[in-house]
Each structure stands twice: as C-alpha cells, then as structure tokens.
C-alpha cells in the first residue's frame, strides 16, 4: 500500500512539473549561485529559493528544505532560514575538489523531493610564471619555456606573447600536452631585440610573468658538427687526427668546440682542454694517446663568447693509434718442481701477457735467456707464456723480453737461486679484506730493499686442486687488490713473496673471502662418550667447500622431549664439547649450527640417551660387597682353623679307646683281653648282636628269682644312668647305629643309641649283704680321655641289698658312640631293638657263642660255660621277643655268679663300624 502511495505522489509531481505537450515546466525552485567555482579551503554559501506555486501545491515552505552533498544529508546546524521561500547552507574550509549539492523538500508522507542541484568546483588561482627562457635552434623557429607554478586543479591557459618595439606578434597559446612551452610561428631575426612574456589564466584569476628582452643571436643553439673522422699517424704512435664539418651558422657567429674521447672499453670520457678548441676550425690532433689503442671521439660547438647553447653531440667516431715497442717488461716468475734426475731440477718459467696499452702492438714472441752463474747463455724463443727447463742445482739468472712489429720491450730479470738457498725476510702484518667488491691485500714492507712482490692465490677446495694465479707488484707497493676473476663464497689462499736482488724471500700466506655467506650445511654432531650426567660430543670440521666463510663459532642446541632448549656457544677451533649437568636415563636431542659473519646453518638433529648408572658405579657397589663377603669368608675360615679343636670337640668328639684306659685296674681280677683278629673276620656280614654279659658271684646261693630281682634293679639303674655316661662311649663316625636291649615294660623310655659300647658291672662277694670296700684306682698314662668314673671315682658306689633278697649290684656304667641319625632319635622302642637282635643270622650266633665260651672257660669253668651256652642257644636267639632277650641277660648273670667269677667289663653292643676294645 505504501509503495502504491509513493508511486502516486511521484506521478503527481511529474504531472505538475510538465506541460501537456511534454515540455519541461519551470522547476519548483533554484540554487544561487548557479555554477560556482570556489577556492580550496575557503567558505561558501548557497541559497535555495522555492517558487510560490510549488509551495502552495505541496503546502511547504523554507522549513521543509533539506540540503544534501553527494547524497549525504547536511546537518541542520549549517542551515539558515532566510524567509518562508529561501534557505541557505554554509560550508567552511572546503577541501573537496568536486561537490554535488542538491536542494530537496519534504512532501506528503515525509518523502524527499529534489528541487534543484548544482556542482561546486574547487581549485586554486594560477601562480605567476617564472624562469621564462627562449632558445633559437639553428634553422628553426624560436621556442620558449617557463615554470607554470603549482597545480591549480582547474583548467589554466598559458599564452606566450612577444613583440618588437614597433610590432606585436601573434600570441602563442600552449597546448594541453605541453602547457609550459610554446614555439612561435614566425622566423627569427638576428641582431634585433625582442620582448617576451607569459600570461596564465583560469576561473579564479589571471597573472602575467616578468618580461624579458633579448637579441635572438644570443639564444642560438647551433647544429652539431657532422662527418667526424679519425686518422692515425705512422710517425707518431701517440696521436690521432680528427676532422669534421661545421654547421652553416658559422657564417653568422664564431664557434668554439668541445672534444671528448675514451678508450673503447672504458665508460668515462676524457676531454681536450677548452682553450685548445676555442676558435672555429674543422680539424684537431689529439696527442699523448697510448700506442696501439682504439679510441672513441665525439664533438660539439657553440657561440664563441659562451652566450647561447651548446649543440648536441656529434656522432661518435673511433680510431687506433699506431704500434710502438712494448712500454713495459712483462711480469716474470718461476716454479720449481722436483726432478727425477740426480743433480737437476725442473724449473717452470711463467710470465703474464702484457695488456694492450703496455704491449703497444701485436705481440710476436717472447725471448728467454738463462745464464748460469759464471757460465754460458741459453736462449729460448717462445710463443706461449711459460717455459719448462731442466736446470742444475746452481744459481741462474733469467731474462725475458717481449717483441712486436716495432721492437722489443725492456728485459725482465729474475734470479733463480741455488737449491741450498735459504729464503729470509718475509713481509710482516699481512692482511686481506674485501672492499668495493674487490679483495685487497695489505702488508708491511721489510727493511731490506725489495725489487718486486709476487702475489699468488688459489681457491681452496676439498674436491679440486689449488690452481694458482699470480700477479706482480712493484717493490714500492704495500697495498693492492687481486686482479682476477674472483668468486664469492670461495676461500682464497693468498701468498705474498718479496723478491730481492739475490732471490726470493720467505713467503707469507693468509686466507680471505671476497664475500662471505652462511654455510651450505651445518656440522654433524655425534657422541664420543656418554655418562650418567654428562656427554662428550664431537664433530668434524666443515669442508671448506661448504663453509662459505670463516667459521666464527659453533652453537650446540640440546633439549629433552619435554624440556626447554639450551644453547651453548663453542669456539670454532674446537671439535668436541662436554655437556654437563645432564639427567640420567634421559633422551636428549642435539643439533649444532655453524656461523660465519653472514649467518649460520643448522646441522641434522641427533639423539642419545644417558645411562641410568655411571661407568664404574655398579662395580663400585659390587666389588666392595664381594670383597666384604670374601673377607668375611676368609675371617670365618681363619677363625675355624684357629678354633678347630673346639669345633671338633662339639661336632666330632674323640672316642676313647677302652683298651688304653685304666678301667681294667678297677678290679684286682681283670679278665684277660681278647684279641680279635679283625672286626671284618668276626662279623663278615656286617651284623652282630647286642649282648649283655653279667658276671655273678659263683658262691652266691640266692635263689634265682632274687637274682632276677637284683638284675631288674640293675637294668633300671642302667636305663636311668644311660644318659649320664662318660665320654668313653662318645660318638665315632666309623660306627653305625644299633638298638639297646631293655625289658618289655620300659619300651617308652628306652633310647636308640647309635654305635654304643655298654658296660655292665656286677660286684660279687661272699657275703651278699656286706658292703664292699671302696676301690682305689690309679691314673693311666694313656692319652685317651678319661671315663666318667675315672674322672670322678667318688661316684662309684656299691649297692647293698638287705632283707629283701636283692643281690648287691654296683652302678652300671656304659659308654655311647653317636655319629649317625639315630643319635637324634633316642626314643626308639625296645621292640625295634629286639627285632634287630633277633635278626642275627646263624653264623653270627655261632661265632659269638664261641667267643663267649672261651671267655667263660677261663673264669668260671666248663660247668658254667655249658649252662651259658644252653641258655644262650635256647633263649637269646629264640623267636626274637623282648622277654627272651631279657632272659638271655638274666641267665648269663646267674651263670657268672654261681661260678664265683670276679667282676669284669665287656661291651654290650658292637655294631659294624663301631669301636671294639681288644
């Protein structure tokens, strides 16, 4: 709906502002001024005036006017309502060159309707033209130039005006493409003054330059000379003759000339002195030129008094001076190579080609003369620049001359010293440095008189040999530059050798670069030694081909995976460095950079891991521990060795030999000893029986039950005292275990004695209830340990049985040997021991029976022996019960007692490996 309303308003406005015939009607208003041109940075006011008919139709007045510049609304603060029909707007400090200003009114619905529009043009007024000058080119019309001043930003017209004193010439308007110059269209008249000035005009103003008055002849610019040619002279090799054709104006004015020349390869010109060419001429001879040298010439002219302008330069012309004999001897040097012939040496003579300005002509050949000291001459004619000869080890004098068409040069003299010559007096303070894209060499001259200096240089490379170039300098020179094709980033080895009258001096060398650059690649670092907290890094010096300059320093960058990077600077002379304060068992990343004066280059990155322990740290721990263990072991062995008797007593006590004891002296009736040939013969099968032999008094009339009762008491005493036996029954490692014999009702308290020798003692007397007197024993001289009874005789007492019918029995003494596992199990049952007794074979029984029979026959007679045998055969080796074993012991006692046998001591048990007293 709003769009339709807007369209209707616009259509109505168009209808009201046009006539029915289509012609435009008068606008609703206008802006004054109509087409303003204002000066930059000035103030400007525009007024918009509305017409009455539009005001009545749209019901508006000046309050409804809206000003806009370039479609942007101007703030109302700049508006001024003059009356109901006019409104003005003011601009201050106009900076824009072009402003579109429109006057608009607000109609129905606050719609803006354009009333009128203008363009404000800004600019500057013209400045006064300056530096007006005119030039009269020969054969052409006068042309004037000036300085138009600042830019006005407006269309500005320049007009050149000229007149004589009596005649005014037509104006010359400058063209748009050349606004500061203009050429008049009339012919120039010499020797008549003319007045000239310039007018400048634009929309903001008009100005006129100063007037100048001159004679055109003083503004003449002649045409350049033409047909320039150069001619040489055969008589004089240092001159060239120039000829040319002068311009036609020479008939009007006197000319002077400016002649310049240069060699063909030069870029700068040399000039003939102006006073030599200050008059009109058509030729000139140039002198003091170099022979056989091509020169280029050019020439120009102007009015003699200098008023006017120089002509343009003529076309260039060239010519070559005639030849002359070489002006200088060539540079001459030598090199000595080892010779394969004894007493000779190979000498290579070398020289430099003379430059054209010194050769003064085409070189035909070289003449070399060798003179040995106080000897004949050797002449050589060479077309090359070197000569190789074989010379003796003597001193030689070499001369060199160069020849052209005109003649020979002066001779270059060179002394070749003998092979034993010692060079001395080198130059001092040798320096080399780049400057102005040249490599300069400087030194301090020796005190001795130097004829010349030889400078040699070559490019150092690891891939190619050092090809030497050289040059010669005069003996008075102490600073020069290397004349050759030098390359950047290359290391040059420069050698300076002073040459004296008697031969060369000692050479001095130095390295230098024409221009340095960063290295082509960085050094490769590697580890030489890695420790727990440090690492020794090493690297190789960079090849000279990739250094590109002097290596000033190295920088080592190292870091862990998560740590910050650390940089360490290292002197360039070092090839290894030790990183300290590292962390053990850590991965490190290392790279290295080499730096020249122009920058650095990083090498490849390298990684290494520090060990967890330092070198020798494990050894430092293990070795002391091992030494301590070894020392402890040695001390233990020494202790055991020193205390071997004590240890042996506790671990392996000595078993006393009863045969060497004084036990036999306890009774005045000691039974004879039985000498058995061998235990192996007695018991070849390794088994024997535990036997108890009890001697009973022969005259004892006590009934058998009482005897048994006494025997039971004896057996109980034996069981109770078995653990208190003396050392006679000690352990022996050669003995084997055997069970002891006890009654069946004492199985739980019996002990399994290993290799035990038991003794039973029965004290007999005619009177049973009479206490026997204490026996006195004497100490044996044997070295065997004493028995318990021997050590303590007071313990030996007799047992008196009274009223009860008990027999008199002494305390039973027995001895043990322990060396087997049965010693640790003393609680073995009597039943087990009985089984061992019953397991004796028949052969053992027969052998034992025979032994017992022999013993009884000596002490008791054949009656007792018969009874003992019968009892032993019937009971002791019967079905193998404990009762039977006990019976065997009892019967033996009765037999011994009835026969009145004196008391004796016999072993109860002898096992294989045990000790058996003889």
From Swiss-Prot:
Entry's Gene Ontology molecular function annotations: ciliary neurotrophic factor receptor activity; ciliary neurotrophic factor receptor binding; coreceptor activity; cytokine binding; cytokine receptor activity; growth factor binding; identical protein binding; interleukin-11 binding
Result for mutant: residue 189 to G: Does not induce ligand-independent activation
Impact when changing residue 252 to G: Induces ligand-independent activation
Glycosylation, residue list: 43, 83, 131, 157, 227, 379, 383, 390, 553, 564
Biotechnological exploitation: Two extracellular parts of IL6ST/gp130 linked to the Fc-portions of a human IgG1 antibody (sgp130Fc) inhibit IL6 trans-signaling by the IL6:IL6R complex and has no affinity of IL6 or IL6R alone. Also blocks IL11 cluster signaling through IL11R.
Post-translational modification: Phosphorylation of Ser-782 down-regulates cell surface expression. Heavily N-glycosylated. Glycosylation is required for protein stability and localization in plasma membrane but not for ligand binding.
Disulfide bonds: 28-54, 48-103, 134-144, 172-182, 458-466
Effect of mutating residue 415 to I: In a colorectal cancer sample; somatic mutation
Positions in the Cytoplasmic compartment: 642-918
Secretion signal, residue range per the UniProt entry: 1-22
UniProt effect for mutating residue 517 to P: In HIES4B; results in impaired cytokine-mediated signaling pathway with loss of response to IL-6, IL-11, IL-27 and reduced response to OSM, CNTF and LIF
Record-listed Phosphoserine modification sites: 661, 667, 782, 789, 829, 839
Region (Disordered) residue spans: 660-681, 722-758
Tissue: Found in all the tissues and cell lines examined. Expression not restricted to IL6 responsive cells.
Motif Box 1 motif: where in chain: 651-659
InterPro entries membership: FN3_dom (IPR003961), FN3_sf (IPR036116), Hematopoietin_rcpt_Gp130_CS (IPR003529), Ig-like_fold (IPR013783), IgC2-like_lig-bd (IPR010457), Type-I_Cytokine_Rcpt (IPR050379), TypeI_recpt_CBD (IPR015321)
Biased composition (Low complexity): 731-755
GO terms classed as biological process: cell surface receptor signaling pathway via STAT; ciliary neurotrophic factor-mediated signaling pathway; cytokine-mediated signaling pathway; glycogen metabolic process; interleukin-11-mediated signaling pathway; interleukin-27-mediated signaling pathway; interleukin-6-mediated signaling pathway; intestinal epithelial cell development
Domain (Fibronectin type-III) ranges: 125-216, 224-324, 329-424, 426-517, 518-613
Recorded coiled-coil stretches: none
Its job: Signal-transducing molecule. The receptor systems for IL6, LIF, OSM, CNTF, IL11, CTF1 and BSF3 can utilize IL6ST for initiating signal transmission. Binding of IL6 to IL6R induces IL6ST homodimerization and formation of a high-affinity receptor complex, which activates the intracellular JAK-MAPK and JAK-STAT3 signaling pathways. That causes phosphorylation of IL6ST tyrosine residues which in turn activates STAT3.
Disease: Hyper-IgE syndrome 4A, autosomal dominant, with recurrent infections: An immunologic disorder characterized by recurrent mainly sino-pulmonary infections associated with increased serum IgE. Some patients have onset of symptoms in early childhood and develop complications, including bronchiectasis or hemoptysis, whereas others have later onset of less severe infections. Immunologic workup usually shows normal leukocyte levels, although some patients may demonstrate alterations in lymphocyte subsets, including T cells. Hyper-IgE syndrome 4B, autosomal recessive, with recurrent infections: An immunologic disorder characterized by recurrent infections, mainly affecting the respiratory tract, skin and eye, and skeletal abnormalities including craniosynostosis and scoliosis. Immunologic workup shows increased serum IgE, intermittent eosinophilia, impaired development of certain B- and T-cell populations, as well as impaired acute-phase response. Disease onset is in early childhood.
Family: Belongs to the type I cytokine receptor family. Type 2 subfamily.
Comment, domains: The WSXWS motif appears to be necessary for proper protein folding and thereby efficient intracellular transport and cell-surface receptor binding.
Name used for this protein in its record: Interleukin-6 receptor subunit beta
Organism: Homo sapiens (Human)
Taxonomic lineage from the root: Eukaryota, Metazoa, Chordata, Craniata, Vertebrata
């Amino acid at each position: 709906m709003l769009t339709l309303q807007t369209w209707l308003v616009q259509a109505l406005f168009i209808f009201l502002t046009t006539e029915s015939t289509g012609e435009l009607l008068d606008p609703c208003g206008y802006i004054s001024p109509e087409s303003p041109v204002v000066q930059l940075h000035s103030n400007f006011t525009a007024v918009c005036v509305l017409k009455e008919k539009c005001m009545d139709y749209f019901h508006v007045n000046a309050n409804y006017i809206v000003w806009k510049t370039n479609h942007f609304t101007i703030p109302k603060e700049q508006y001024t309502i003059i009356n109901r029909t006019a409104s003005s707007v003011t601009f201050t400090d106009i900076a824009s060159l072009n402003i579109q200003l429109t006057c608009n009114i607000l109609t129905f619905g606050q719609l803006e309707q354009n009333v009128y529009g203008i363009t404000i043009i800004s600019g500057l007024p013209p400045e006064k033209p300056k530096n007006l000058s005119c030039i009269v080119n020969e054969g052409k019309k006068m042309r004037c130039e000036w300085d138009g001043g600042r830019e006005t930003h407006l269309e500005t017209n320049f007009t050149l005006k000229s007149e004589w004193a009596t005649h005014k010439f037509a104006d010359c308007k400058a063209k748009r493409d050349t606004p500061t110059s203009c050429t008049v269209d009339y012919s120039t008249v010499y020797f008549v003054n003319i007045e000239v000035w310039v007018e400048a005009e634009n929309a903001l103003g008009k100005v006129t330059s100063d007037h100048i008055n001159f004679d055109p002849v003083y503004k003449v610019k002649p045409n350049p000379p033409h047909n320039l040619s150069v001619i040489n002279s055969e008589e004089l090799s240092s001159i060239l003759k120039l000829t040319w054709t002068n311009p036609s104006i020479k008939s009007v004015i006197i000319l002077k000339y400016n002649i310049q020349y240069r060699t063909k390869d030069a870029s700068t010109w040399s000039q003939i002195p102006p006073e030599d060419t200050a008059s009109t001429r058509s030729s000139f001879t140039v002198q003091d030129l170099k022979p056989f040298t091509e020169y280029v010439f050019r020439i120009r002219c102007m009015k003699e008094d200098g008023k006017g302008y120089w002509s343009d330069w003529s076309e260039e012309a060239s010519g070559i001076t005639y030849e002359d004999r070489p002006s200088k001897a060539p540079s001459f040097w030598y090199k000595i190579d080892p010779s394969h012939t004894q007493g000779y040496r190979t000498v290579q003579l070398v020289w430099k080609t003379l430059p054209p300005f010194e050769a003064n002509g085409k070189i035909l050949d070289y003449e070399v003369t060798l003179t040995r000291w106080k000897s004949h001459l050797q002449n050589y004619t060479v077309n090359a620049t070197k000569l190789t000869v074989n010379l003796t080890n003597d001193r030689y004098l070499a001369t060199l001359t160069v020849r052209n068409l005109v003649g020979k040069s002066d001779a270059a003299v060179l002394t070749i010293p003998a092979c034993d010559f010692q060079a001395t007096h080198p130059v001092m303070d040798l320096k080399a440095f780049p400057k102005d894209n040249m490599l300069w060499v400087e030194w301090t001259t020796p005190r001795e008189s130097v004829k010349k200096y030889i400078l040699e240089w070559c490019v150092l490379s690891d891939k190619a040999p050092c090809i030497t170039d050289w040059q010669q300098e005069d003996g008075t020179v102490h600073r020069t530059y290397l004349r050759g094709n030098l390359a950047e980033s290359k290391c040059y080895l420069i050698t300076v050798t002073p040459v004296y009258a008697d031969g060369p001096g000692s050479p001095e060398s130095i390295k230098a670069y024409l221009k340095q650059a960063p290295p082509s690649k960085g050094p490769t670092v590697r580890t030489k030694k890695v420790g727990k907290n440090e690492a020794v890094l090493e690297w190789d010096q960079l090849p000279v081909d990739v250094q590109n300059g002097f290596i000033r320093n190295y920088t080592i960058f190292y870091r862990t995976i998560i740590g910050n990077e650390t940089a360490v600077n290292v002197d360039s002379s070092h090839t290894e460095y030790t990183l300290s304060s590292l962390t053990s068992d850590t991965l490190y990343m290392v790279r290295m950079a080499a730096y020249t004066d122009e920058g650095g280059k990083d090498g490849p990155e390298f990684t290494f891991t520090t060990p967890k322990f330092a070198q020798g740290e494990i050894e430092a721990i293990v070795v002391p521990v091992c030494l301590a263990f070894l020392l402890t072991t040695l001390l233990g062995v020494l202790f055991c060795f020193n205390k071997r008797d004590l240890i042996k007593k506790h671990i392996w006590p000595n078993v006393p030999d009863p045969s060497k004891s004084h036990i036999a002296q306890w009774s005045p009736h000691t039974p004879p000893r039985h000498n058995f040939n061998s235990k192996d013969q007695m018991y070849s099968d390794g088994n024997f029986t535990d036997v108890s032999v009890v001697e009973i008094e022969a005259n004892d009339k006590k009934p058998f039950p009482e005897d048994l009762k006494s025997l039971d008491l004896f057996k109980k005493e034996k069981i109770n005292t078995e653990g208190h036996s003396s050392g006679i029954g000690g352990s022996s490692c050669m003995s084997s275990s055997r069970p002891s014999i006890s009654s069946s009702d004492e199985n739980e308290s019996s002990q399994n004695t290993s290799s035990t020798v038991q003794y039973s003692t029965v004290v007999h007397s005619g009177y049973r209830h009479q206490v026997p007197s204490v026996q006195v024993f004497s100490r044996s001289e044997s070295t065997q340990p004493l028995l318990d009874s021997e050590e303590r005789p007071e313990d030996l007492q007799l047992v008196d049985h009274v009223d009860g019918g008990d027999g008199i029995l002494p305390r039973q003494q027995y001895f043990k040997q322990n060396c087997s596992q049965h010693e640790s199990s003393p609680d073995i049952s009597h039943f087990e021991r009985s089984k061992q007794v019953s397991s004796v074979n028949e052969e053992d029984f027969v052998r034992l029976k025979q032994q017992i029979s022999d013993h009884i026959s000596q002490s008791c007679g054949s009656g007792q022996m018969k009874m003992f045998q019968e009892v032993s055969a019937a009971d002791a080796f019967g079905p193998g019960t404990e009762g039977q074993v006990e019976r065997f012991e009892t019967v033996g006692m009765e037999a011994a007692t009835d026969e009145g046998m004196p008391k004796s001591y016999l072993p109860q048990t002898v096992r294989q490996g045990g000790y058996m007293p003889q």
